[in-house]
A protein has these predicted regions:
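N-terminal signal peptide c-region/cleavage motif recognized by signal peptidases
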Residues: 21-26
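Solvent-exposed strand-loop boundary residues in beta-sheet-rich modules
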Residues: 129-131, 187
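Extracellular beta-sheet repeat scaffolds used for adhesion and glycan interaction
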Residues: 131-155
């Protein structure tokens, strides 16, 4: 069987095929948004690696009891870094040899390795340079506790000055007296 095509029909078919092949489809566009957020929580770090060194205590002269003697005073800095806006509280414990109430502990320096009943050197740590406000322990550990030192962070490193005092007139044996204080920051 022989099929005959008219030349004009072939031309129309070719032109139609070219047209169909060159037809373009427009793509549909959709837009959406992506929300990006970050939640920054309260966070702090503390650096209490400094040493408060009471050197030169002499209870028979400079630091003698009575009107002529004075307490031996020193200071040290504790560094803290908290996210901006964080409310924090710095507290200190009584130390290894401390006694007294949490709000106003009596801290004691002792000769390392000495018997438990060996003489100790009383001292304390204060929040102010007038030596009026003892650095308490902060019983509940909350950020509003009166025993510690409260701060609202600005995002920068902060130094908190701790003031120490050894009361005058303590006649104790010679030696190197030490104590270890745990410093905490609660936020």
């Amino acid at each position: 069987m022989k099929i005959k095509f008219k030349q004009s029909n072939i031309k129309v078919a070719i032109a139609s095929a070219i047209m169909v092949g060159s037809v373009s489809f427009s793509s549909a566009g959709y837009a959406a948004t992506l929300t990006v957020n970050a939640v920054i929580g309260e966070a702090c770090v503390i650096d209490a690696s400094t040493t408060m060194s009471f050197s030169g205590y002499n209870a028979t002269t400079t630091h003698a009891a009575g009107n002529g003697g004075v307490n031996l005073v020193k200071s040290a800095n504790i560094g803290s870094l908290c996210n901006a806006g964080t409310t924090a509280l710095i507290n200190m414990n009584k130390g290894l040899n401390g006694a007294g109430a949490d709000a106003a502990p009596t801290r004691k320096l002792a000769i390392s390795g000495a018997a438990a009943d060996a003489p100790k050197l009383n001292y304390n740590l204060y929040k102010d340079d007038g030596y009026n406000f003892v650095f308490g322990i902060g019983g509940s550990g909350g950020v509003t506790d009166a025993g510690g030192l409260s701060l609202v962070a600005d995002g920068n490193s902060n130094n908190v000055t701790v003031y120490g005092s050894i009361p005058k007139g303590q006649l104790v044996p010679t030696g190197t007296y030490t104590d270890t204080i745990n410093v905490t920051i609660t936020y």
